[in-house]
């Protein structure tokens, strides 16, 4: 999945959920890094990180996707799907972080950098925080 959609002008506050679907401690740690990086990047862009989902204009969800690296390969590749949903549930934006990365090449630093880079595509909110 690639970046799709643009956050509408009424989105000023975003609740960031913890990433789901981690199958190992390393993926859980990378998910925590992704959450922190998303909050920091969104705030740096002028969005308000809502402390509660009910207070947010939209919710950013992250889900780990795990697959085999080819038909007969025992190696696994991972990617983190990020989806921004409006309160009503419609998708406003979606992107893939570290798509198709072999598990042994995944690092917290790479996740942090890629999350920040991909969320830049949202652009700034219309009236700041």
Model-predicted regions and their roles:
Residues 1-14, 35-44, 48-49, 85-129:
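C-terminal/domain-edge helix-coil "capping" segments
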Residues 16-18, 49-75, 80-81:
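A short, hydrophobic beta-strand-centered structural micro-motif
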Residues 19-29, 101-106:
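Second-shell loop/turn segments in exported
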Residues 24, 68-70, 90:
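Residue-level signal for secondary-structure boundary sites
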Residues 25-30, 38, 42:
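Extracytoplasmic/periplasm-facing segments of secreted or lipoprotein envelope proteins
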Residues 26-33, 48-54:
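A generic short-segment signal for beta-strand/edge and adjacent turn/coil regions
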Residues 29-31, 62-64, 74-75, 106-113:
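Surface-exposed beta-strand edges and their flanking turn/coil or helix-capping segments
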